[in-house]
Regions:
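Catalytic core of membrane glycerolipid acyltransferases/transacylases, capturing the structured
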Residues: 52-68
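Short glycine-enriched loops at secondary-structure junctions
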Residues: 47-53, 72-75, 101, 113
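Ordered, amphipathic secondary-structure segments that act as subunit-interaction surfaces
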Residues: 80, 93-102
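Short, surface-exposed beta-edge/turn micro-motifs
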Residues: 40-43, 94
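Short beta-strand segments
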Residues: 46-48, 70, 97-101, 165-170
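Divalent-metal-activated hydrolytic enzyme cores
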Residues: 1-38, 64, 73-91, 106-186
């Protein structure tokens, strides 16, 4: 019997196809009709609202397979966390990813400190003002914030129903690299 790949394995395989220019995902008209009847995404993703970051394309997934929450700097606001909880509780996603990306304008502006008070104030910055390190730090901290603020998501991990991960997409190459991954211990 063939083992079904885990959701994270499926997304990483899709990202490999995307990086290699061998995408297979298509969104045919018949698929839209199916989606009008069922909403069962494979994963939930908190990502940046940057127009260059489109999880369905980056992970080579068809319409309906990803529940995407996007906000500048992939900041886990209360509304974003509640949306992710909805995906876990009611849609049954088995994977939650916080997806940062290289060349993030929101993190860059937060580092520059030349913005109106409050704008990007929730971006987690490391003590070293290096853009690459700041992007990785912010992505990891966004996942930690979700885990700190959502008992529902934490319980879903502990019960073995959910895997959570953080990672960064390289805009130039398209490659997504996992930074942290948490799942129930077996």
């Amino acid at each position: 019997m063939t083992e079904i790949p885990s959701p994270i394995d499926q997304l990483l395989a899709g990202n490999k196809r995307y990086v290699e220019g061998k995408t297979t995902s298509s969104n045919k008209p018949g698929h839209r009709h199916e989606l009008s009847e069922v909403h069962a995404p494979l994963a939930a993703i908190l990502c940046c609202s940057d127009a260059r970051v489109v999880p369905e394309i980056v992970f080579d997934q068809p319409l309906g397979s990803l529940f995407t929450c996007s906000v500048a700097g992939n900041i886990p606001t209360t509304e974003m966390i509640e949306s992710l909880e909805y995906a876990v509780s009611f849609l049954g996603v088995q994977l939650l990813i916080v997806m940062g990306h290289t060349s993030c304008g929101a993190v860059k502006e937060a580092l520059a400190s030349e913005f109106p008070r409050g704008l990007f104030s929730h971006i987690a910055l490391p003590s070293v003002p290096n853009l690459h390190e700041a992007i990785m730090h912010n992505t990891k901290e966004s996942l930690k914030t979700i885990l700190d603020r959502s008992p529902l998501i934490l319980d879903s991990i502990e019960s073995g129903d959910l895997t959570v991960a953080s990672g960064v997409q390289d805009i130039a190459s398209g490659k997504f690299t996992v930074l942290d991954c948490y799942q129930a211990e077996e």
